[in-house]
Amino acid sequence: MEELQGYLEKDRSRQQHFLYPLLFKEYIYTFVHDRGLNSSVFYESTEIFGYDNKSSSVLVKRSIIRMYQQNYLIYSVNDSNQNRFVGHNNYFYFHFYSQMILEGFAVIVEIPFLLRLVSSLEEKKIPKSQNLNLRSIHSTFPFLEDKLSHLNYVSDILIPYPIHLKILVQILQFWIQDVPSLHLLRFFLHEYHNWNSLITPNNSIFLFSKENKRVFRFPYNSYVSECEFVLVFLRKQSSYLRVTSSGAFLERTHFYGKIEHRIVVRRNYFQKTLWFFKDPFMHYVRYQGKAILVSKGTHLLMKKWKCYLVNFWQYYFHFWSQPYRIHINQLSNCSFYFLGYLSSVLINPSAVRNQMLENSFLIDTVIKKFDTRVPVITLIGSLSKAKFCTVLGHPISKPIWTDLSDCDINDRFGRICRNLSHYHSGSSKKQSLYRIKYILRFSCAXTLARKHKSTVRAFLQRLGSGLLEEFFMKEEQVVSLIFPKTTSFSLHESHIERIWYLDIIHINDLVNYS
């Protein structure tokens, strides 16, 4: 018990105070601007309404001055809710100020977690280059390839999200004791949740929209991280349980370290359940709200884990989690979708003839191999939702891009095609990507033909296929840019060999679209 108390005190000592005054510092918003986030208000909102980006600094200073006024933000939200369709400029100023505060607030509340990460890396003396490599999504697959071939069962878990927003704020109270900051976060969650209901019927979509995902995914990821503490706690209490967990945070802003510190409550409650959770081969991997739990144990053990997780979410977070969100399957008989790949364990039986003196006999052996493939049907569904093709996979034009130049249209389609090829370089059968490339290629041709008011056939006959070829770099050319010419690696083997890159720090948008 004394060890548990010391563990809690160590975590609590790292809680940061007085974060709220940083909202009034101009350099915070300059830092947000310099980071160049894709969803930053400095780049998107000003362009939507026709304002110049250079005026952002002026608006930042004006907003900081107005924030000193009492209840300014509350009056602004109420006024915008009542008169949002009256004035274009008033709506822009409210939108800009609120988004600016959201961006700055998101950076500020991340400070305690970034400090913990830096101190953890310094204590473990992990080189910076190695830390960057661990951030790559592809670094997860060599781990799975090494471990899954020796395991039996897998639990495919969809982590539920809490219905009430106050649960997210209550979780952050363990890490941040700055009361004004927590009140401000609760205010944003409440007001924006109601304000967006005028636009989007499904309020849960707003919490994860691209415009506000940075600040609203922060409490959500804290909640997911809190869900994982039970796994780490059981590992610490049982010498036989070894759990490895890496969590991703906000695409480019990650909790990219090994998770080791969690709040622990009611130790007596866990002591009654430790005995049937002991498993020398238990591994856990998560990305966003999707997780897999693999084990060498029996099906009964996996059912106990499922029952425990459902009850844990119900009694600890006070909401019901549907049991169907956890699927238990045998690795040798199923495939599971994770990180944009359809993964499975293939069994290759073989017979070896052995002869000893005058006697000969056959030895049957089974070789297990971890296999990753491209989920073509899922990708076609994502392309259909993005309006690149029909549901059946027939390419269609992209009318919204017809106002761009021919070079920009080719560049956009080519970039999408190369990114998909780069992300799925670890597939054992890259030929399945040919259909995806075909859809993008002819969607690009159909878009260009629509722009020039011509047919696809006439457009290609007039300009030739070379116009499209240069924007679709082959996988061999990508590999040749990475491996030196003196290497013994054959470029023709790139269609067979799996290649995992260490520069992919977020999942492809089309892969994550479905």
UniProtKB/Swiss-Prot annotation:
<keyword id="KW-0507">mRNA processing</keyword>
<dbReference type="Pfam" id="PF01824">
    <property type="entry name" value="MatK_N"/>
</dbReference>
<comment type="function">
    <text>Usually encoded in the trnK tRNA gene intron. Probably assists in splicing its own and other chloroplast group II introns.</text>
</comment>
<dbReference type="GO" id="GO:0006397">
    <property type="term" value="P:mRNA processing"/>
</dbReference>
<comment type="similarity">
    <text>Belongs to the intron maturase 2 family. MatK subfamily.</text>
</comment>
<protein>
    <recommendedName>
        <fullName>Maturase K</fullName>
    </recommendedName>
</protein>
<keyword id="KW-0819">tRNA processing</keyword>
<keyword id="KW-0934">Plastid</keyword>
<keyword id="KW-0694">RNA-binding</keyword>
<dbReference type="InterPro" id="IPR024937">
    <property type="entry name" value="Domain_X"/>
</dbReference>
<dbReference type="GO" id="GO:0008033">
    <property type="term" value="P:tRNA processing"/>
</dbReference>
<dbReference type="GO" id="GO:0009507">
    <property type="term" value="C:chloroplast"/>
</dbReference>
<keyword id="KW-0150">Chloroplast</keyword>
<dbReference type="GO" id="GO:0003723">
    <property type="term" value="F:RNA binding"/>
</dbReference>
<dbReference type="GO" id="GO:0008380">
    <property type="term" value="P:RNA splicing"/>
</dbReference>
<dbReference type="InterPro" id="IPR002866">
    <property type="entry name" value="Maturase_MatK"/>
</dbReference>
<dbReference type="InterPro" id="IPR024942">
    <property type="entry name" value="Maturase_MatK_N"/>
</dbReference>
<dbReference type="Pfam" id="PF01348">
    <property type="entry name" value="Intron_maturas2"/>
</dbReference>
